[in-house]
From Swiss-Prot:
Organism: Campylobacter jejuni subsp. jejuni serotype O:23/36 (strain 81-176)
Organism domain of life: Bacteria
SMART domains recorded: EFG_C, EFG_IV
Matching SUPFAM superfamilies: EF-G C-terminal domain-like, P-loop containing nucleoside triphosphate hydrolases, Ribosomal protein S5 domain 2-like, Translation proteins
InterPro entries named among the record's database cross-references: EF-G-like_DII (IPR053905), EFG_II (IPR041095), EFG_III (IPR009022), EFG_III/V (IPR035647), EFG_IV (IPR047872), EFG_V (IPR035649), EFG_V-like (IPR000640), G_TR_CS (IPR031157)
Protein name (database record): Elongation factor G
Length: 691
C-alpha cells in the first residue's frame, strides 16, 4: 500500500498562541473548512473538538496537544494543538519538537502577550518557520498595525504583512491580498461562507500599494536573482513572489502576517492557503539530528526509503483504547502488527494498532509514512522523548530537555482504601507528563507531587478525581529550594576503620568551587601518579553526588558546584569502593560547610497587566513580596509591570490581585532562575527544616 499524500504535500503545523488569542477557535475553523467537523464547536460553550479533556472544557484553556489530521487542496495537514497557559510550556516545547511550521495567533487588541514571548522563544530554539494570524479583527480596539509593531519590537522578528485589513471592529469586512492585489470580502456574517474577490476599495488603494512595496522589498532580499530584478526595476511575477515569501519564511528571515476573525469565519481559507503555500513540507526543513550509542552523530533524512525512525512525543490515556503514544515518523514507515525498537531504552516494542486522530474521532490505519503523525496503541516501555527505530539502525534522535519542577505539595487520598488507586493514577499521569514528578518523603512517608506551577498541580489533582475517581487532600505548597556554595575551598578527608579482620580505608583531597548559576554539577579527576587507583575514582564521584542530594544548611539539593579530586592515598588491602565513596561524601559535606553555603530559591518572572489607577497598589504589593520590578510598559491603555518575585511569596497571588484591582488586572508567571535567599529568610527556612 503506497502513501496517499506525497511527502511534498504534507504539513505538520502547530497553532501557538497566548490564552484567549482565539487559538482553539482558529483550530476549530480550520477543521470546519477542511471538511472534518460538521458543527463548529465554540470555546465559549465548551464544545470545541480539539479541547477533548474535561477540565479544558470548564477552564476554556487548552491543555493537551491533540494531533489532528485534515485535508486542504489535496494537502494533508497534521494540526498539533499547543496549550497557551504558562504552566504547560512543557507541552508547547514538546509539540515544537515535532512541528515543521507554526501559525502564531495574536489577538488584534492584546497583541504580543508574555506567553507569546515564551512560545516565540521556544519556536526560535527549534528553528520553526511561522506565519502570523492576527485574530479577532472584529473586536473593539482591534489594530492590525499595532500588532505588527509589537512583533518587530518585542519579539525582534521581521513581520511582513501579506494582507491588510478592510476596516476593523464592527466594520471588518475582509482583507486585501497584497500578493494578487485583490480584495477578499466575506459578505455573510452569520455563517461560514467563501469569500468574494473584488477590486481594492479606492480609499485603501494607497495603503495597499505602500504595503505591497514593503512586501516586495522583503521578498527580493531572499535571493540574489530576485534582488537584481527588483533593483533593475522589473516586476516580479506571482510565482517569484510566492517562492520568495516561502524562502524567507523557511530561513526565518521574514514572518508573513495575515489577519481575520476566526469566530466570524473571516480569513480562515486564505490562512489555509498560506499554510500550504509558505510553510515547509517535512523534507524542506533541516534533517533531524541523531546519534548512535557510541556517540557518532548522524542526520536523519525525511524519506520513505530507509530504516524506520520516529519520535514518541506525547502519551495519553484514552478511555476506550488505553494508552496512546503519539509518534512522529521521520524516516521509513511504521506498520501496525510489526515490531519497533526503542533505542532510548534498548527494548523491543510490538506495534499494536495504529490510529490517526481527527480531534475526537479516530480512524484505524495500516501504515504511518515519513513525515506523518499518528498514535500507537499498546506500547509498554516507551515514554515521551523516546526514539522508536528499526533494529537494523538503532539511531537515537535528539532528546528533549524537560525542566525540573519548582513547586511541590503533599497529597493523600481521602480514604485509606484509595491509597493504591492513587499511586496508580499518579504514576500514569507522570508517564504522560515529564515535567510532573511523584516521590515519597522519606521522613513522613507522604506522597509528594511536584510540577511547574500551582495550576499545573491543581489540574493533576483534578484529573485524579475525574479519570481515576480518587479524591485527594492537598497539603500546603512547598518550594523547591536548592543550596550552593560561594567560596572555593580545599578539604582533606580520611575514612579509616580498623575493626579486626579487613578494615576500611579511603583518603581524598577535594577542591570545591562555585560555578555559574544553572551549570549543575561537574566532577574533575586530577589525580597524578596513581595515588588513588583509577578503579576508585567513579566511587569518589558517586560519593560526592550522594552528598549533593542533601545540602549542609537545610538538606536541599546542592547545585552549581565543581568538585576536583586532586590527591589522596589508599591501602593495598583495606581500600574499597565503599570506603572511597564514604570519604568523598563526608569530605564534601565538611568542605561545603566552610565554602559559604547559601540557600537558593526559584524566582518567577511575573507580568501584571493592570489599569493605571491600581498601578501603585500592585507595585507596592510586589515589593512586599520581595519582588524586584524590572520594567513598565503600556499595552492597550493598561500598564504592564514585569517583575522577578520569589515563588515562596507568590502563593495565592491571584486572589490578592483580584481584590486589589477589583478583578480588573491579569497576571502570568513563569519560572525564570534561581537566586540567593536573603539571610533573614534563609534563617527561617533552616529553623523550620531542622526544627
Amino acid at each position: 500500500m503506497s502513501r496517499s499524500t506525497p511527502l511534498k504535500k504534507v504539513r505538520n503545523i502547530g497553532i501557538a498562541a497566548h490564552i484567549d488569542a482565539g487559538k482553539t477557535t482558529t483550530s476549530e475553523r480550520i477543521l470546519f473548512f477542511t471538511g472534518m467537523s460538521h458543527k463548529i464547536g465554540e470555546v465559549h460553550d465548551g464544545a470545541a473538538t480539539m479541547d477533548w479533556m474535561e477540565q479544558e472544557k470548564e477552564r476554556g484553556i487548552t491543555i493537551t496537544s491533540a494531533a489532528t489530521t485534515c485535508f486542504w487542496k489535496d494537502h494533508q495537514i497534521n494540526l498539533i494543538d499547543t496549550p497557551g497557559h504558562v504552566d504547560f510550556t512543557i507541552e508547547v516545547e514538546r509539540s515544537m519538537r515535532v512541528l515543521d511550521g507554526a501559525v502564531a495567533v495574536f489577538c488584534s487588541v492584546g497583541g504580543v502577550q508574555p506567553q507569546s514571548e515564551t512560545v516565540w522563544r521556544q519556536a526560535n530554539k527549534y528553528g520553526v518557520p511561522r506565519i502570523v494570524f492576527v485574530n479577532k479583527m472584529d473586536r473593539i480596539g482591534a489594530n492590525f498595525y499595532n500588532v505588527e509593531d509589537q512583533i518587530r519590537n518585542r519579539l525582534k522578528a521581521n513581520p511582513v504583512p501579506l494582507q491588510i485589513p478592510i476596516g476593523a471592529e464592527d466594520n471588518f469586512k475582509g482583507v486585501i491580498d497584497l500578493v494578487t492585489m485583490k480584495a477578499l470580502v466575506w459578505e455573510d456574517d452569520t455563517k461560514p461562507t467563501d469569500y468574494v474577490e473584488k477590486e481594492i476599495p479606492a480609499e485603501l488603494k494607497e495603503k495597499a500599494e505602500e504595503y505591497r512595496t514593503k512586501m516586495i522589498e522583503a521578498v527580493s532580499e531572499t535571493s540574489d536573482e530576485l534582488m537584481e530584478k527588483y533593483l533593475g526595476g522589473e516586476e516580479l511575477s506571482l510565482e517569484e513572489i510566492k517562492t520568495g515569501i516561502k524562502a524567507g519564511c523557511l530561513s526565518l528571515s521574514i514572518v508573513p502576517m495575515l489577519c481575520g476573525t476566526a469566530f466570524k469565519n473571516k480569513g480562515v481559507q486564505p490562512l489555509l492557503d498560506a499554510v500550504v503555500a509558505y510553510l515547509p513540507a517535512p523534507d524542506e526543513v533541516p534533517n533531524i539530528k541523531g546519534e548512535y550509542e557510541d556517540g557518532t552523530e548522524v542526520s536523519v533524512k525525511s524519506t520513505d526509503d530507509g530504516e524506520f525512525a520516529g519520535l514518541a512525543f506525547k502519551i495519553m490515556t484514552d478511555p476506550f483504547v488505553g494508552q496512546l503514544t503519539f509518534v512522529r515518523v521521520y524516516r521509513g514507515c511504521l506498520e501496525s502488527g510489526s515490531y519497533a525498537y526503542n533505542s532510548t531504552k534498548d527494548k523491543k516494542e510490538r506495534i499494536g494498532r495504529l490510529l490517526k486522530m481527527h480531534s475526537n474521532k479516530r480512524e484505524e490505519i495500516k501504515v504511518l509514512y515519513a513525515g506523518e503523525i499518528g498514535a500507537v496503541v499498546g506500547l509498554k516501555d516507551t515514554l515521551t522523548g523516546d526514539t522508536l527505530a528499526s533494529e537494523k539502525d538503532k539511531v537515537i534522535l535528539e532528546r528533549m530537555d524537560f525542566p525540573d519542577p519548582v513547586i511541590s505539595v503533599a497529597v493523600e487520598p481521602k480514604t485509606k482504601a484509595d491509597q493504591e488507586k492513587m499511586s496508580i493514577a499518579l504514576n500514569k499521569l507522570a508517564q504522560e507528563d515529564p515535567s510532573f514528578r511523584v516521590s515519597t518523603d522519606e521522613e513522613s512517608g507522604q506522597t509528594i507531587i511536584s510540577g511547574m506551577g500551582e495550576l499545573h498541580l491543581e489540574i493533576i489533582v483534578d484529573r485524579m478525581l475525574r479519570e481515576f475517581k480518587v479524591e485527594a487532600e492537598v497539603g500546603q505548597p512547598q518550594v523547591a529550594y536548592r543550596e550552593t556554595i560561594r567560596k572555593t575551598v580545599e578539604q582533606e578527608y580520611k575514612y579509616a576503620k580498623q575493626s579486626g579482620g579487613r578494615g576500611q580505608y579511603g583518603h581524598v583531597f577535594l577542591r570545591l568551587e562555585p560555578l555559574e548559576p544553572g551549570s549543575g554539577y561537574e566532577f574533575v579527576n586530577d589525580i597524578k601518579g596513581g595515588v588513588i587507583p583509577k578503579e576508585y575514582i567513579p566511587a569518589v564521584d558517586k560519593g560526592v553526588q550522594e552528598a549533593l542530594q542533601n545540602g549542609v544548611l537545610a538538606g536541599y539539593p546542592v547545585e552549581d558546584v565543581k568538585v576536583t579530586v586532586y590527591d589522596g592515598s589508599y591501602h593495598e588491602v583495606d581500600s574499597s569502593e565503599m570506603a572511597f565513596k564514604l570519604a568523598a561524601s563526608m569530605g564534601f559535606k565538611e568542605g561545603a560547610r566552610k565554602a559559604g553555603a547559601v540557600i537558593l530559591e526559584p524566582m518567577m518572572k511575573v507580568e501584571v497587566e493592570t489599569p493605571e489607577d491600581y498601578m501603585g497598589d500592585v507595585i507596592g504589593d510586589l515589593n512586599k513580596r520581595r519582588g524586584q520590578v524590572n520594567s513598565m510598559d503600556e499595552r492597550g491603555g493598561n500598564k504592564i509591570i514585569t517583575a522577578f518575585c520569589p515563588l515562596a511569596e507568590m502563593f495565592g497571588y491571584s486572589t490578592d490581585l483580584r481584590s486589589q484591582t477589583q478583578g480588573r488586572a491579569t497576571y502570568s508567571m513563569e519560572f525564570d532562575h534561581y537566586d540567593e535567599v536573603p539571610k533573614n529568610v534563609a534563617d527561617e527556612i533552616i529553623k523550620k527544616r531542622n526544627g
